[in-house]
């Protein structure tokens, strides 16, 4: 039986098989709320070992774990540690560093100096030097969360829609231009500072469900949609040999 990798985020739930270190095709599963969809959970794959990375609410994580423990002989939950597989985290308290960010760094190690950007509910930015040293990062709201926050405080502002323009002439266009533009500007600023700090070339790696709307404005970028799962596979290999 195969092992399986599960990436449970704040808004997306993905899985992929893992066989002899090779990740299979990625499946996007129905996202689960705290009320849970029992049928969707029962449709989760079965296998030998399940490796779970979760940044979801505790109630959702608990429900998913309960089902995985039925479907698998063993369940292991990924957690951030100070050093793993060549990567050393900058945080003085590594447990405060999100496991999704941690795994994305594991997945990108070995590709030189990289600025790793995750676009989901939050926008996360982390600088990883070629020697595996994490040099810190930033957390901001993603464009989607910015739109949601604005709509929550002013219902007349739409949640979606609009086209990116540098100087928009209607509200929908102004919203997408402002929110996406803020994210692009933060990424560009971080990339500039990364070059200044390292005095070397730095690759820009993007992952996460909200990446598509930013890609056209970021120039030379590598899109790595499976980066967290790639890192989880590395973490699984380390865990299996402990």
Swiss-Prot record:
Its EC number is 2.7.1.33. Keywords: ATP-binding, Coenzyme A biosynthesis, Cytoplasm, Kinase, Nucleotide-binding, Potassium, Transferase. A monovalent cation. Ammonium or potassium. Its cofactor is NH4(+); K(+). GO terms for cellular component: cytoplasm. It comes from the Bacteria. Pathway: Cofactor biosynthesis; coenzyme A biosynthesis; CoA from (R)-pantothenate: step 1/5. It catalyses: (R)-pantothenate + ATP = (R)-4'-phosphopantothenate + ADP + H(+). Substrate binds at residues 91, 98-101, 171. Signal peptide: none annotated. ATP binds at residues 7-14, 121. One of its GO terms (molecular function) is pantothenate kinase activity. The keyword Transcription does not apply. GO terms for biological process: coenzyme A biosynthetic process. Coiled coil: none annotated. The active site is at 100 (proton acceptor). Its main location: cytoplasm. SUPFAM superfamilies: Actin-like ATPase domain. It is found in: Cytoplasm. CDD domains: ASKHA_NBD_PanK-III. Belongs to the type III pantothenate kinase family. Catalyzes the phosphorylation of pantothenate (Pan), the first step in CoA biosynthesis. NCBIfam families: baf, PRK13327.1. Homodimer. This is Type III pantothenate kinase.
């Amino acid at each position: 039986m195969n092992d399986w990798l599960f990436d449970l985020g704040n808004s997306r739930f993905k899985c992929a098989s893992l066989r002899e270190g090779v990740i299979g095709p990625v499946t996007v599963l129905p996202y689960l709320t705290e009320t849970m969809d029992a049928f969707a959970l029962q449709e989760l794959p079965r296998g030998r070992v399940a490796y779970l990375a979760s940044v979801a609410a505790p109630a959702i994580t608990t429900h998913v774990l309960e089902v995985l423990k039925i479907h698998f002989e063993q369940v292991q939950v990924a957690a951030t540690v100070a050093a793993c597989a060549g990567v050393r985290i900058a945080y003085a308290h590594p447990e405060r560093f999100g496991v999704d960010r941690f795994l994305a760094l594991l997945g990108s190690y070995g590709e030189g100096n990289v600025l790793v950007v995750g676009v989901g509910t939050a926008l996360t930015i982390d600088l990883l030097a070629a020697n595996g040293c994490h040099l810190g990062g930033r957390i901001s709201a993603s464009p989607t969360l910015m739109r949601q926050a604005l709509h929550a405080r002013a219902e007349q502002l739409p949640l979606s829609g609009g086209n990116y323009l540098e100087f928009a002439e209607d509200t929908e266009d102004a919203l997408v231009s402002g929110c996406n533009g803020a994210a692009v500007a933060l990424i560009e600023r971080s990339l500039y500072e990364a070059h200044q700090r390292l005095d070397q070339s730095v690759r820009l790696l993007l992952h996460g469900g909200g990446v598509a709307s930013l890609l056209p404005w970021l120039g030379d970028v590598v899109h790595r949609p499976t980066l967290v799962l790639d890192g989880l596979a590395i973490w699984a290999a380390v865990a299996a040999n402990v």
